[in-house]
C-alpha cells in the first residue's frame, strides 16, 4: 500500500506558514475579518480538493482512507494549539496542557476538516472507478 501525500504536504506547509504569519502579525486577523466567510469557503474547497488529489495519486482501501483523513485533520488542526503552547512558553516560560488550547471550536473545525477531506477522497476514488 503506497500513499502519496505530496498534495497534503504542500497544503500542510502553507497552513503552517499562515499560522506563523498570524503569530508574528496578529493584527492581520482584523484586516481579514470582513472576508472570513469567503476564506472559509475557499478553505473548505481546498481541503476537499487536497483529499481528492491524495486519493487519485494513491490507491488505498476504505479504512485507510478514513484513517488518513483522521490523521491529516488532526495534524492540520493541531498546528494552532501547538503554536499557542510555544508562544506561551516563549513569553511566560509556562506550558499549559494541550487540552487547554483545544477548545470546542477546534473539535468542530476538526470534524468539518475530516469530513471534507474524506469526502474528497471518496469522490476521487469513485470517479476513478467510473462510478461518478
Task: Name these PLM-found stretches.
Residues 26-34, 80-108:
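Interfacial non-cytosolic loop connecting adjacent transmembrane helices
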Residues 1-44:
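N-terminal signal-anchor transmembrane alpha-helix
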Residues 38-58:
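Canonical alpha-helical transmembrane segments
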Residues 2, 53-64:
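Membrane-interface helix-boundary motifs at transmembrane edges
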Residues 43, 65-91, 109-113:
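Hydrophobic alpha-helical membrane segments
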Residues 4, 11-15, 19-22, 93-132:
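Alpha-helical membrane-associated segments of multi-pass integral membrane proteins
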Residues 5, 11, 40, 47, ...:
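Small-residue packing motifs within transmembrane alpha-helices
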Residues 17, 21, 25, 50, ...:
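Alpha-helical membrane-inserting segments
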